[in-house]
Amino acid sequence: IGNWWSGSENDVLPAGAAADGYRSATFHASGAETPLHKDIKKYVYDKGKGAGDVDRIYEVLYIRGLLNHIFAMEAVRNAQEHFGVKVPSGEQTRWGLENMHMTAADWERVGLPGFAEIKVTCEDHEGGHPVLFQRWDASAKSWTVISDWIPVMRDVVRPMMEADAAKYAAENNITPRD
């Protein structure tokens, strides 16, 4: 079983049939024909402006790229709304990132229905995001989600992370910021 960064097509295709049944964690499904994918096909690929094979827009790493762009876009949108500005500063955009809350309605609005809610704060840059598990089908060359959303174990993991961060800061003479 791999974690989320070892669960893309690039990780399994080179292994061919030997990768069949491989499982990995993920924070999003792949391969779905979402409204956003339909728009990308219509407004980009159908107009001859796409780079690469259109079928790759369904792959794990492409979707992660989409998510990064969505988070940046939503940070700017949050900052615009909160500060009442058209072009937010870097500090205002940081506020937008640190106060992001993507609800089911927000995911629907951006064309990715079914994605898990994410709420980011200064104290929690992870967003409290649950995880899915997926299995690779080598013959179909596709991932299948094989679990429901599994919540993070914050009560177990967070104290260990904070203790390790404090130890590292002390060893390296770093003053932690609030």
Regions picked out by a protein language model, each given a short descriptive name:
Residues 51-62, 73-146:
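Segments of small-molecule ligand-sensing domains
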Residues 97-106, 135-178:
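Conserved C-terminal helix/tail region of periplasmic/extracytoplasmic solute-binding proteins
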Residues 1-69, 149-153, 164, 168-175:
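Extracellular/periplasmic periplasmic-binding protein-like sensory domains
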Residues 1, 21-29, 112-119, 131, ...:
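Generic preference for hydrophobic/aromatic residues in regular secondary structure cores
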Residues 7, 85-88, 160, 174:
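Short coil/turn linker and secondary-structure boundary residues
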